[in-house]
Amino acid sequence: MTTMPNWLKQRAFLTPERIAVSDGRRTKTFAELYEAAAVWARRLAQAGVKEGDIVALLMKNRIEMIEIIHALFFLGARVLLQNVRLTSYELGWQLDDSGARLAIADEELAGSLDGDGRVLTVGAVAALPEVDVSLKETCDLEEVATIMYTSGTTGTPKGVLQTYGNHWWSAVGSALNLGLHERDCWLAAVPLFHISGLSIAMRSVIYGMPMRLQTSFDPKEANEWIMRGDVTIMSVVAAMLQRMVAELGEARYPDTFRCMLLGGGPAPRPLLEACKEKGIPVYQTYGMTETASQIATLAPEYSLTKLGSAGKPLFPAELCILKDGKPAAPHEAGEIVVKGPNVTKGYWQRPEATAQAIRGGWFFTGDIGYLDEDGFLYVLDRRSDLIISGGENVYPAEVEAVLLSHPDVEEAGVTGVENETWGQVPYAFVRLKRGASPDEAALRAFCRERLAKYKVPARIYFVDELPRNAAQKLLRRELKRLIPKTEQTF
């Protein structure tokens, strides 16, 4: 067992008057954040939350979300972060699978969990009386702090276990790579329910660094904060960065802005060239929920000479490429395998999936890539067939499962198609049962009832057969060939 002082308690002790978080309207110091989190903890104890419980949060970015996360840490509870874009069915499934004791939701989101007796709105929790409770003063780095569900290539959602140690070493690795400056302030315009957003909140208390919080991404406001020198680091995906560059116009960021951390897949060359011309320091990254954020990062000086690369592994992580169980040669494609204290210990109540993913201390990502002769990582396929749409992961198997649940559908295949706005969008290919009539609008409506909006196929094509290999395995990479040539843009 390796313990250390509770991060927020220790930070409030070390630098109580330093700014912890601001949303442009409200600002809180670490001392104020600590006091607020303690109040939430005493209210949540009144609601019956105790050590070891799993408590779900369905909230958009706001200061109260950060306070409640730390409040649950004070009680020794595990925090299940839920994506606000999911459907009621998807959210309810996560609650049932995790065995969550309680779900806390923003007032406008509580309807997504309507009828579930475990749900309390943030306002309802705020109205609870406080009870005397002993707040945990330490954290065990081996204990699970947070859980985030990821569907994986099987389409079956799995809860990724993120320990305090995972978050700690992710923060340390990032600091050793990016450095830590006295005037640093990290802008969180990405959702806190994603690891990219949550990692900023964790780093804030570990570093003693203020964070700026956007409820939802606003490129104009983000640029204004950067131009004023209020922000020095920002996490984005390519679609966000494109909007910021367009909104920036002929202006240039001040020297106070030192890092644009770009995730969600390699950026298109024109965007990188525009950033280089404007002097925007872009750091491309590779990471996932299972690695508690970035595990490899490309420094800006290599952004064009190593175009498309995700860089090199961060301290103290390791990364290699395996082909047929052996180390691959430079430029030889194979599976990306990673190791380090920021890597998950496994999946919630999924021992078989955990054993398949973690072997000999190495995490097999399922992603395909290669290392060049200088050791720079290039990712070829994200989780084989993973679609990344606007920074959100869309797993074809999950969408296919919904399509196959329709009584008229015999077969279904889903793949990603390039899109200027979102990077990729899902396209579906369906073979109907005999006698059924094709109705794209009705089938998309069926999907909208069961899937988050970004997972709903942008187009559905009706075909006579789907491409399969000799073993009858669906060849998703061949699906785009089924798009009529008059509609192809690739």
From Swiss-Prot:
Coiled-coil positions: none
HAMAP family, per database record: MenE (MF_00731)
CDD domains: OSB_CoA_lg (cd05912)
Domain of life per record: Bacteria
Gene3D superfamilies: 3.30.300.30, N-terminal domain of ligase-like
Protein name: 2-succinylbenzoate--CoA ligase
Reaction equations catalysed: 2-succinylbenzoate + ATP + CoA = 2-succinylbenzoyl-CoA + AMP + diphosphate
NCBIfam families membership: menE, PRK03640.1
Organism of this sequence: Geobacillus kaustophilus (strain HTA426)
Function according to Swiss-Prot or TrEMBL: Converts 2-succinylbenzoate (OSB) to 2-succinylbenzoyl-CoA (OSB-CoA).
Recorded family membership: Belongs to the ATP-dependent AMP-binding enzyme family. MenE subfamily.
Primary enzyme class: ligase
GO terms, biological process: menaquinone biosynthetic process
